[in-house]
Amino acid sequence: MIRGLFVGRFQPVHKGHIKALEFVFSQVDEVIIGIGSAQASHTLKNPFTTGERMEMLIRALEEAGFDKRYYLIPLPDINFNAIWVPYVESMVPRFHVVFTGNSLVAQLFKERGYKVVVQPMFKKDILSATEIRRRMIAGEPWEDLVPKSVVEYIKEIKGVERLRNLATNLESSEKELQAPIRVPEY
């Protein structure tokens, strides 16, 4: 049995992730889906918790008709590239091939002797979690870029409101940082 590894942050899960996973599932018997930056949430770059991202993946994979040939594994960041692959190896079941669109991830796994497949990227200019988060904050249409089940879930957890609050709080903090320092007069 061949098991593949696919790592992403999924902030949020979008149709590009699902298309990539379709390709991955066509190549292997089982897939380990590593949820990167698992420790991060409630920031503009990582607004959703690991549990929320897992729920998005479960719903989106079910909606897409995937069977249960996958494992969802949280992967907190360690910010130390030289030991990242052994760290991942210690956190997930054994795997044989790595699927990625990230050149650094590809290099790190190749250096450890893994077969690496660069999976096709789909409309990466708009099927990007960064672009989707930007649209959510700006009040622009984003729903057609993510699976319907993920749209419903983001609405359930008030994810757009969370992102907008984070953006508003950041703007306020930046304004405070840019304000001139006033020395009290005595």
Swiss-Prot record:
This is Nicotinamide-nucleotide adenylyltransferase. Belongs to the archaeal NMN adenylyltransferase family. Pathway: Cofactor biosynthesis; NAD(+) biosynthesis; NAD(+) from nicotinamide D-ribonucleotide: step 1/1. NCBIfam families: arch_NMN_Atrans (TIGR01527), cyt_tran_rel (TIGR00125), PRK01153.1 (NF002243). It is found in: Cytoplasm. GO terms for biological process: NAD biosynthetic process. Its EC number is 2.7.7.1. Its main location: cytoplasm. GO terms for molecular function: ATP binding; nicotinamide-nucleotide adenylyltransferase activity. GO terms for cellular component: cytoplasm. CDD domains: NMNAT_Archaea (cd02166). Keywords: ATP-binding, Cytoplasm, NAD, Nucleotide-binding, Nucleotidyltransferase, Pyridine nucleotide biosynthesis, Transferase. It comes from the Archaea. It catalyses: beta-nicotinamide D-ribonucleotide + ATP + H(+) = diphosphate + NAD(+). Pfam families: CTP_transf_like.
